[in-house]
């Protein structure tokens, strides 16, 4: 018997509950065949203008404000110390809050790429310094989005 895993958005099993299904298949010694399709993570790196040689995807950051600010500062430090692009996502209804937190936690010269609705109608991918974003953040409520920071 065969089965497939399809993701509603993004790539199955990457920051997706499909990973649980794949883990079960691996434990049962079933053959797993990944198929190539669009990955918003890779597409956002490609469109950002950031380092595509060294990058890290962190999934969802902490919700608690203090922990989130601490994590954002840690990721920004990795940008400058390791020259590594940092990627993360947020639940769409919290995107605007995430952008505000990035603006508060990170340096004005740090670059932020906002990649939203990738491969969909209304696709939005822009890279600017935080100083350039100030006062001009888009409304991303209820839109799938990836955030990337770099120097």
Stretches found by the model and what they are:
Residues 16-78:
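Class I SAM-dependent methyltransferase SAM-binding "motif I" and its flanking Rossmann-like core
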Residues 8-9, 38, 60, 116-118, ...:
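Fold-independent oxyanion-binding glycine-rich loops
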Residues 1-17:
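Ordered, amphipathic secondary-structure segments that act as subunit-interaction surfaces
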Residues 11, 61, 65, 88-92:
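Conserved phosphate/pyrophosphate-binding and hydrolysis machinery centered on Walker-type P-loop NTPases
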């Amino acid at each position: 018997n065969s089965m497939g895993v399809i993701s509603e958005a993004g790539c199955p099993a990457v920051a997706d509950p499909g990973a649980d299904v794949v883990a079960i298949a691996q434990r049962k010694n079933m053959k797993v065949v990944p198929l190539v399709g669009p990955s918003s993570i890779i597409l956002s790196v490609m469109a950002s203008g950031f380092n595509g040689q060294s990058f890290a995807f962190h999934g969802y950051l902490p919700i608690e404000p203090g922990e989130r600010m601490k994590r954002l500062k840690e990721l920004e430090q990795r940008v400058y110390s390791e020259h590594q692009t940092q990627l993360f996502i947020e639940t769409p209804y919290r995107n605007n809050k995430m952008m505000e937190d990035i603006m508060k936690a990170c340096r004005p010269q740090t670059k932020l790429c906002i990649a939203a609705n990738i491969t969909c109608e209304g696709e939005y991918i822009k890279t600017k310094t935080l100083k350039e974003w100030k006062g001009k953040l888009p409304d991303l409520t209820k839109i799938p989005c990836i955030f990337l920071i770099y120097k």
